[in-house]
Amino acid sequence: MKSVHSSPQNTSHTIMTFYPTMEEFADFNTYVAYMESQGAHQAGLAKVIPPKEWKARQMYDDIEDILIATPLQQVTSGQGGVFTQYHKKKKAMRVGQYRRLANSKKYQTPPHQNFADLEQRYWKSHPGNPPIYGADISGSLFEESTKQWNLGHLGTILDLLEQECGVVIEGVNTPYLYFGMWKTTFAWHTEDMDLYSINYLHFGEPKTWYVVPPEHGQHLERLARELFPDISRGCEAFLRHKVALISPTVLKENGIPFNCMTQEAGEFMVTFPYGYHAGFNHGFNCAEAINFATPRWIDYGKMASQCSCGESTVTFSMDPFVRIVQPESYELWKHRQDLAIVEHTEPRVAESQELSNWRDDIVLRRAALGLRLLPNLTAQCPTQPVSSGHCYNPKGCGTDAVPGSAFQSSAYHTQTQSLTLGMSARVLLPSTGSWGSGRGRGRGQGQGRGCSRGRGHGCCTRELGTEEPTVQPASKRRLLMGTRSRAQGHRPQLPLANDLMTNLSL
């Protein structure tokens, strides 16, 4: 195993790049543990370049008709390297249409000499011409034959959320696709519940990432409260809204340590718990992302604070994680007497016997159901899609997070779309022996936020003087369902334009 490092910006922790062999690439959990043993988590972000013989997908020439149900125009305001961002919903379009739009004269990447030159152009371009992001599309472009690092079934302990509580949250424990163009941006945030995340750039132009080491996350939060006082007064964890852009120059001027890394096609980026990150796309591209967890994350999950205004709430019960991964702390935790202490530099946590037993039990249950022994084939399948804002919890798992934390985590918020079921249809649809397609409708206007009980409250803001709806980023769709019916390896289609165009409410 070998790795290289990026050049740090005012920090002693560097972004490491790893080059696993095919043998090392076979076990996702083991390799993540190795990365942390090398200190990769201390920077908050790491790059993994897969072996040359590995492929996520053989060809990408068959995705032109995938539907982007709710493209989002990203409008920024501000000056001096400090900006806020909001989204305006645009009409649905196919990926082929989006590609042509991204490469048009109006939206194409400007001429530049190198990545550093393009980065300067990016920050100088704000507010400027607002780009359109094809974000938060439920689905996966990984082929079923891809066994290693397939984002649809990584096989981490985040599977406990679905297997023990029957909870599915799109974009958290199911993959999301992101079609980007020049200047499309993800603002400063940490992941929902301070989870890990993994992002694979399938094809296209690069993506630039900024990251603040987890041990300096509170420093960034303090600076953000000073730079955005009006927003911060309305919410204790307003960075969860994913609206704040802060340039590298401003970070340097205020002594905030950070790193920068460019991701190119065919590369993975892994974010670590409580690692604030932001970035932008260099041009037309397609990325896929999902959250995951390791035993080291449990204490972060216990302490993850939540959005206090209700704009962006994604939370779930920590009960199965503490009970199975930290059985020695379970009774204290139930009585709120377990004082978790997060150690940002601790590389890994020993696995409990209960967790080992759980892993063995999953293998036995899959075998009994006649399932293929993939690392994470755990799809729950009610007979009908679950509508946004409604829930069914068969096991009675609570969803209240234990309160009390000095940390202000931020959510990886998403814009709720009309309910187009892509790879999440693997979770939502029964296996019928043929490919399935799901249909449904969201509540529109960015409504249907997930909350601690799975209820959608709905929230929308409208910019004065415009006819198009503007939306604040909403949380990912939360789906609770039975845990008995399982998918049997049949891969449903991503949403196609002909399937859903007539059902859209725009």
From Swiss-Prot:
GO MF, one annotated term: histone H3K9me2/H3K9me3 demethylase activity
Binding site for 2-oxoglutarate: Y133, N199, K207, K242
Gene Ontology CC: one annotated term: nucleoplasm
EC numbers: 1.14.11.66
InterPro entries: JmjC_dom (IPR003347), JmjN (IPR003349)
Domain JmjN: from-to ranges: 15-57
BP terms from Gene Ontology: chromatin remodeling; regulation of gene expression
Binding of Zn(2+), residues: C235, H241, C307, C309
Compartments reported by the entry: Nucleus
Catalyzed chemical reaction(s): N(6),N(6),N(6)-trimethyl-L-lysyl(9)-[histone H3] + 2 2-oxoglutarate + 2 O2 = N(6)-methyl-L-lysyl(9)-[histone H3] + 2 formaldehyde + 2 succinate + 2 CO2
Comment on bound cofactor: Binds 1 Fe(2+) ion per subunit.
Primary subcellular site in the record, as a coarse category: nucleus
Domain JmjC per the UniProt entry, residue ranges: 143-309
Domain of life, per lineage: Eukaryota
SMART domains membership: JmjC, JmjN
SUPFAM superfamilies for this protein: Clavaminate synthase-like
Alphabetically ordered keywords of this record: Chromatin regulator, Dioxygenase, Iron, Metal-binding, Nucleus, Oxidoreductase, Transcription, Transcription regulation, Zinc
Cofactor: Fe(2+)
Stretches for region Disordered: 432-473
Positions annotated to bind Fe cation: H189, E191, H277
Alphabetized Pfam families for the sequence: JmjC, JmjN
PANTHER family, sorted: LYSINE-SPECIFIC DEMETHYLASE, LYSINE-SPECIFIC DEMETHYLASE 4E
Stated role: Histone demethylase that specifically demethylates 'Lys-9' of histone H3, thereby playing a central role in histone code.
Protein name per the record: Lysine-specific demethylase 4E
